[in-house]
Structure formats: C-alpha cells, structure tokens
Amino acid sequence: MTKIETRTEPMVLNMGPHHPSMHGVLRLIVTLDGEDVVDCEPVIGYLHRGMEKIAESRTNIMYVPYVSRWDYAAGMFNEAITVNAPEKLADIEVPKRAQYIRVIMLELNRIANHLLWLGPFMADVGAQTPFFYIFREREMIYDLWEAASGMRLINNNYFRVGGVAVDLPYGWNDKCEDFCDYFLPKVDEYEKLITNNPIFRRRVEGVGTVTREEAINWGLSGPMLRGSGVKWDLRKVDHYECYDELDWEVQYETAGDCFARYLVRIREMRESVKIIRQALKAMPGGPYENLEAKRLQEGKKSEWNDFQYQYIAKKVAPTFKIPAGEHYVRLESGKGELGIFIQGNDDVFPWRWKIRSADFNNLQILPHILKGVKVADIMAILGSIDIIMGSVDR
C-alpha cells in the first residue's frame, strides 16, 4: 500500500485591526504552519494623529489637554512628562506639596493602568469575570480624579509647569485613604481568584518567555523588563518628584513569562497603595504651584482668575518661553519608560518634541517571541505586553 505524502502550504492569517482582543487597532499578519506560528508582522499606524508635530505649534499650556490621548488608559503620566520636560529645561523648581500631589495622582494612575490591563488580559486567556470587577475599582479612582480635577478618565488637564492646576479640595485626602482601605483586600481577592487557578496557570506559565539579556537588548522597560529579572525602575533610578522620601520596593520576577509579568503588575498595585498612604501622611502645607513660574506664564489679571474658571487654561497666558537647549526627560509609567526629548529655541513653542512611548518599544519584541508558539497563545502573549495603540501610533 502506498502512502500519500501530504504537504501543507503555510497559511497567512490577518488578525485585526478590528478584533476586540487586539487592544486597539493593531493588525498582525501571522504565518501559520498548522497550529504553529512561523512568522508574525505587526502593522501599526492606524491611530497616528501627528502628536509630535502638533506639539511644535502649541504652547505647553495649550498642549497639556492633548496628551491624555497618547495612552488614553493612563493620561496623568502623559501630563506629568509634558510639564516635566520644560521644567527641567528651564530649571523650574516644583514646591514640595505639588510634588506629593503629583506622586499621589501618578500612583492612582498606575493602579488604574494595571487594572485596565488585568481585565482584558484575563478575557484574552478565557476568564471573563475579572473584567467586570476591575471597572468597579477603576470607577472609584475616576471619582477621586473628578473631585480633584473636574474630569474623569482623560483630559484631566491637572498638571502645570511648576506645580498643579489647583490644590486638592477639602476632604479629598480622607476619600483617597478610604479608597486605599477598600482596594487592598480587593487585590487579595484577585490573587485568590486568579493566581493559583490551574487553567490560568497552564495558559500563561512558560508562554512568551523573554530572557534577561533579550529584555535589555530589545530596549524593553516597565513590567516587561522587571518580569525578566531586571530590577530597574526609573522612580528609584532617576529620583524624580519625592519618591526618594517614601519607603517602597521595586517588584520583579525572574521567569520572564506571561505569568511573571502578571505577578509584577499585581504586586506593583500593592506598592502603589503603600506609596499613596505614605504621601497622604507626609504631605506638607505650602503652595501647590511655583508662583515664579506662574508669573512667567500669566497674562494680565482679569475675571478669568475667578473661582468658576479655575480649571480653564485661559487662566495662564502662554507667555512662558522655552529656553534654547535640548533635554531628555523620562518617568516610569504603568507600561514602562515614557520619555520626552525636547528642543527649545527661546520661543513659546518647542522646536522639537519627540515622544518615546514605552509600549511602542515593548511591542517590537512581539514577532521574536511569537515564533514557534501555538496560535492560541498569541492573544495571551500580546495581552501580557500591555499596549495601547494611541500611545504606540501617537
């Protein structure tokens, strides 16, 4: 009896750009041999809006509302880096109280970022329930932001060169403390529900492994880097704001797989609560903005300084000139290193505004770690990277 040899041609499959688990408008051109991935080519750019070019024709005050749209799951980080760049270039000092307020806002944003990563990631690996839980917690963070800045998810427009737009309202600190008391047991609940679930463990352990050397060579940052055994966190490395005055640990894992990245993010949420509690306790009095920086920015006094207009950008006229020179400023966002390269030429507009987003750099390793995996693992690996296409494409 003669055996007939069957040879299958590789199949080319388009995943996205409108698939719910693609985390935005990402398109993957995947070449499959049966169930195995032979090659993968990510196609990006569907959400490109020219954010860097827009910055070159906007003053800093005018540009702050735009930046929430880079990484629209965590807008505060974008605002922080947008004001940090001119601050460092012009050597403007930020008052202590403003630093503490900023740290609290950034850590709330880190928790919100990791929550919005956790829900869709669990949905990607087949667990639907946590997706509904995370919005219950995020809703409380939205309430805190709304009380402080007037806006909930994006366009908080809260950070300013030399400080923040307005001081925290009366009772906000107690409300934030209540959130911390409520949220910590919820993280334990997530752990109980997810971490030792045998189905979840089989889906993520040993999948999408990135070694320590690969993580460094590919320029990864954030939980992608720390999940591969590199103890690198810009809050410790760059000593920005008042993180040095607070007691907290850098969370890292050595396995480098999807499960390690999950553990890093879960533990970072706990550390963020720890940081927020300390910052609330240690927050000093004093001004919430650098009055000298404000004087540089402010136009003539008018009714725009009135209480009901306090959030409107008209309050400060865009007369602040960015000094000649260039500078690279970075901070640790929920996804990794978010940086701005700014070039000023003694004008109200920056001459060059280059955005270095964490998820754009983290996404580039995807084709490398997808080679040889099963097609069902693509979603788990992509989900573990934590990308937002607004930030990737800008």
Swiss-Prot record:
* TM region positions: none
Where is it found, in Gene Ontology cellular component terms?
A: plasma membrane-derived thylakoid membrane
Question: Record keywords: Transport included?
Answer: yes
One family name in Pfam for this protein:
Complex1_49kDa
- Quote the subcellular location field of this record: Cellular thylakoid membrane
Subunit description: NDH-1 can be composed of about 15 different subunits; different subcomplexes with different compositions have been identified which probably have different functions.
Q: Which family does it belong to?
A: Belongs to the complex I 49 kDa subunit family.
Q: What does this protein do?
A: NDH-1 shuttles electrons from an unknown electron donor, via FMN and iron-sulfur (Fe-S) centers, to quinones in the respiratory and/or the photosynthetic chain. The immediate electron acceptor for the enzyme in this species is believed to be plastoquinone. Couples the redox reaction to proton translocation, and thus conserves the redox energy in a proton gradient. Cyanobacterial NDH-1 also plays a role in inorganic carbon-concentration.
Protein name as it appears in the record: NAD(P)H-quinone oxidoreductase subunit H
Organism of this sequence: Synechocystis sp. (strain ATCC 27184 / PCC 6803 / Kazusa)
